[in-house]
Amino acid sequence: YHLGGPPVTLKLPPGTPAGRTMRARGKGAVRKDGTRGDLLVTVDVAVPQHLSSEAREALEAYRKATADEDPRAELFKAAKGA
């Protein structure tokens, strides 16, 4: 679906999970009064099915470099505080 106007670019915060909905204020469809509504964008993460050996090596290097980090720690902390 094309809303007209230039493409919209969103900057996603690091760690944004798949399924999160982001709002781009004033970037949506044109209303009857001529103003634009908000554009809601749902993050969809595409995971490659096949990796080249170079890409696989890069991911392995990244895994080793971040071995001490637990990306789920923040999720658990947020869930306990909610």
From Swiss-Prot:
Its cofactor is Zn(2+). Residues 1-33 are annotated as: Disordered. InterPro entries: DnaJ_C, HSP40/DnaJ_pept-bd. It holds the Pfam family DnaJ_C. The keyword Zinc applies. Binds 2 Zn(2+) ions per monomer. Its main location: cytoplasm. Belongs to the DnaJ family. Participates actively in the response to hyperosmotic and heat shock by preventing the aggregation of stress-denatured proteins and by disaggregating proteins, also in an autonomous, DnaK-independent fashion. Unfolded proteins bind initially to DnaJ; upon interaction with the DnaJ-bound protein, DnaK hydrolyzes its bound ATP, resulting in the formation of a stable complex. GrpE releases ADP from DnaK; ATP binding to DnaK triggers the release of the substrate protein, thus completing the reaction cycle. Homodimer. The J domain is necessary and sufficient to stimulate DnaK ATPase activity. Zinc center 1 plays an important role in the autonomous, DnaK-independent chaperone activity of DnaJ. Zinc center 2 is essential for interaction with DnaK and for DnaJ activity. This is Chaperone protein DnaJ 1. It comes from Streptomyces albus G. The lineage of its organism: Bacteria, Bacillati, Actinomycetota, Actinomycetes, Kitasatosporales.
